[in-house]
Amino acid sequence: MVSFDATEALAPYREGRGYGAIVFDRERLRQADASLFSPQSWGDRARPVDKGGRGGAWFVDAPFGRSVLRQYLRGGMAARVSRDRYLWKGAGRTRSFAEFRLMRELIKRKLPVPRPLAACYLREGLGYRAALLMERLENVRSLADHAQLAGRGAPWEATGQLIARFHRAGLDHPDLNAHNILFDAGGHGWLIDFDRGVLRIPATRWRERNLKRLHRSLLKLRGNRSGEDVDKDYERLHRAYELAWGRGY
């Protein structure tokens, strides 16, 4: 359940034959329009993010701070039908608005996530396109990078503890992979990419599903490391997770 947030503002807009809306953090942005979500409008202040995901993301040097712009893109078989259009089910169920509000709720619960700044959708007929703008985390490296560079020295225990903390709050992260777990040089961790995420009553089934998803991604991204080495590292992560879960944090 995502609670009401009085600092959230809403602005309708039109573009061509479509119509949509922008939700934004009015403590960070005085106003918002569609240009926020166009990398072309940022010119040389926007540059593509080249690691992880399906593309469609840019680092943006904005007046309100260094940010990340992400356009929602489909993968797999669905991308053959449309790369960037989703079936309209109502404004509150758009991918962008749902993720924006979920991230704000996680921040209220004192969890380490990037601060969302604005989200939009543009509806045309039965479909819509969407985008999200959020603050950029500085000087961080993904668990995927740590695993490639440090192997056994990567922050496996810290990762398990971090995931347990989010699970204790009820976050079901359907795309928990090694690119979506970040650490800075001081060992502080964050989770990112909450598309299709949801808050649930903590239960073993969905928690284990998240962890299995992470395990598969570690095996996929192992590079020259053996599957046996990856499994041993994952066991360290899982043990730390279970200990943290048992302690209640």
UniProtKB/Swiss-Prot annotation:
<dbReference type="InterPro" id="IPR011009">
    <property type="entry name" value="Kinase-like_dom_sf"/>
</dbReference>
<comment type="function">
    <text>Catalyzes the ATP-dependent phosphorylation of the 3-deoxy-D-manno-octulosonic acid (Kdo) residue in Kdo-lipid IV(A) at the 4-OH position.</text>
</comment>
<keyword id="KW-0547">Nucleotide-binding</keyword>
<keyword id="KW-0997">Cell inner membrane</keyword>
<comment type="pathway">
    <text>Bacterial outer membrane biogenesis; LPS core biosynthesis.</text>
</comment>
<dbReference type="GO" id="GO:0016301">
    <property type="term" value="F:kinase activity"/>
</dbReference>
<dbReference type="GO" id="GO:0005886">
    <property type="term" value="C:plasma membrane"/>
</dbReference>
<protein>
    <recommendedName>
        <fullName>3-deoxy-D-manno-octulosonic acid kinase</fullName>
        <ecNumber>2.7.1.166</ecNumber>
    </recommendedName>
</protein>
<dbReference type="Pfam" id="PF06293">
    <property type="entry name" value="Kdo"/>
</dbReference>
<dbReference type="GO" id="GO:0016773">
    <property type="term" value="F:phosphotransferase activity, alcohol group as acceptor"/>
</dbReference>
<keyword id="KW-0808">Transferase</keyword>
<dbReference type="InterPro" id="IPR022826">
    <property type="entry name" value="KDO_kinase"/>
</dbReference>
<keyword id="KW-0448">Lipopolysaccharide biosynthesis</keyword>
<keyword id="KW-0418">Kinase</keyword>
<comment type="similarity">
    <text>Belongs to the protein kinase superfamily. KdkA/RfaP family.</text>
</comment>
<dbReference type="GO" id="GO:0009244">
    <property type="term" value="P:lipopolysaccharide core region biosynthetic process"/>
</dbReference>
<keyword id="KW-0067">ATP-binding</keyword>
<dbReference type="GO" id="GO:0005524">
    <property type="term" value="F:ATP binding"/>
</dbReference>
<keyword id="KW-0472">Membrane</keyword>
<keyword id="KW-1003">Cell membrane</keyword>
<feature type="active site">
    <location>
        <position position="175"/>
    </location>
</feature>
